[in-house]
C-alpha cells in the first residue's frame, strides 16, 4: 500500500524491504530497536503498573484506492495522511497533560533543528499555553546518550533562527538545559524521570 503526505510525497516508515533479507542495524544499547519502539514498550510498562497513561498518537489516513481480490476482502493500495502530524505522544501523568516528540540523530556535537517542522513547534506553543508538560526525547545514537529536553527551550532555539541563530542545538546546551536518561530493564526508557524533573521545575513539586 502506498501512503502519501499531504504534499503528495510518498511516506516511508522503514518497514518495507526488498526481497533480500536485511538485518536492522543496532542503533542503541545493543537492542536493535528504534527509539519509537523502545518508547512504546516503556509506555506499555507504565500503563501496566498504573503509573501513567501515554500512547502514540494515531495519524488520520484518507484511503483513495482499494482493491477487492475477494468479495469478503479489501486491500488498500493507496492512501494519504489527511493532515500533517503534530507530535508523537500524549497522555496523563500525576494529573498533568503530557505531549512530546521522539527524535534521534547520529550527530555527536549538536541536534539539527531541521528534524522538526513548523506545525510541531506551533503545537507545542499551544499546549504550553494550556500548562501542558511538553518536551522532546532526544537520542544521540552514536554517543549512546538520551535526554528529555523542554519544549520551551526548543521553541527558543527555533525562534532565533531567522535572526541568525544556530540551525542546531549544541549538545552542551542539551546537557545543561535538559535531563539525561539512563536506559534500564523496565522501563526501557524511564522518561518519566525527566517528566518529574520538568514538573519540579514548572510547579516546584517534590519528586514522587
Swiss-Prot record:
GO terms for molecular function: endonuclease activity; magnesium ion binding; nucleic acid binding. Coiled coil: none annotated. The keyword Nucleus does not apply. It comes from Lacticaseibacillus paracasei (strain ATCC 334 / BCRC 17002 / CCUG 31169 / CIP 107868 / KCTC 3260 / NRRL B-441). It catalyses: Endonucleolytic cleavage at a junction such as a reciprocal single-stranded crossover between two homologous DNA duplexes (Holliday junction). Its EC number is 3.1.21.10. Belongs to the RecU family. Keywords: Cytoplasm, DNA damage, DNA recombination, DNA repair, Endonuclease, Hydrolase, Magnesium, Metal-binding, Nuclease. Pfam families: RecU. The record marks 103 as: Transition state stabilizer. It is found in: Cytoplasm. Mg(2+) binds at residues 86, 88, 101, 120. Gene3D superfamilies: 3.40.1350.10. One of its GO terms (cellular component) is cytoplasm. The keyword Nuclease applies. This is Holliday junction resolvase RecU. Endonuclease that resolves Holliday junction intermediates in genetic recombination. Cleaves mobile four-strand junctions by introducing symmetrical nicks in paired strands. Promotes annealing of linear ssDNA with homologous dsDNA. Required for DNA repair, homologous recombination and chromosome segregation. Its cofactor is Mg(2+). It is an enzyme of class 3 (hydrolase). Binds 1 Mg(2+) ion per subunit. One of its GO terms (biological process) is DNA recombination.
